[in-house]
Structures are given as structure tokens and as C-alpha cells.
Amino acid sequence: MEAHASNASGSAGKWSPAPDASEIVKSIHAMLHPRNIVLVGATDKPGNYAERFWNNLVKYKFAGGLYPVNPSAGEILGLKAYPKIGDIGRPVDLAIIVIPAKFVPASLRECAAAGIKSAVVISAGFKEAGKDGTLLEEELK
């Protein structure tokens, strides 16, 4: 089924039907109450935003599984680091993505391929960075 509508600028567009409400609720629940978290861009370099985020998850003993993803690290804060999301091989509820904007679209595609339904992106360089950033932001929609 396809619905036709006008967007805010008045141009006609095609919208897909809304997803099943129960799937939306599951996605939100996974974001707010994750059993497992992957941190894309994890690092142990002091002062780095991803390091502080990761350090807090470890320090305050997040009860679920923690999976750091960084293609150039073997271990981060005592946990095995994975080069790619797909290498984890376990179900993950939430991805926290702390990487440069140009890598975010590919990372979100990896999340989708791995069955991760919720993600939080902490990055800069999208619409606020000009034309190239606007194109990146459009790619995420």
C-alpha cells in the first residue's frame, strides 16, 4: 500500500504506511532498557567523548553485555573489542555510535544488518556543517 501526501514545502511525495505500533514500542523499549549495548567508536584514549561514555558504562557496572567496536583496537578497558558490528555474533538491543559523521550511515547499515533496532548517534558534521553535512543527514532519513 502506498499513501500520497505533501511535505512541509508543499511538494508531493510518497509515504510508506506506518510500521506496526508494537514494533515501535519494542524499539523504544530496547533503547530505554537495553540488555546489551554496542559502542561504535569505543576507545580508551583519555578525554575522548567515547572513552568517557564507555568508561562510565564499565565503571558503573552496566548489568548487560557491553561490546566495544573499534577496527584498530584489540581490547578496551578489559573487554574484547570487535572490528565490526557484525563480528559480535550476539543479539544487541542498542547501538551507541560515537564516530565522525561521514562514517555514521555505513555504521547504521551495519546495525540494521545485525538486527539492532535502536541506535543513538553522537556526532557532529551533519546539517550544521553545510552542504556535505546536509547530504549525509538526508542519507540517514
Model-derived segments and spans:
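Catalytic-core regions of core metabolic enzymes
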Residues: 2-141
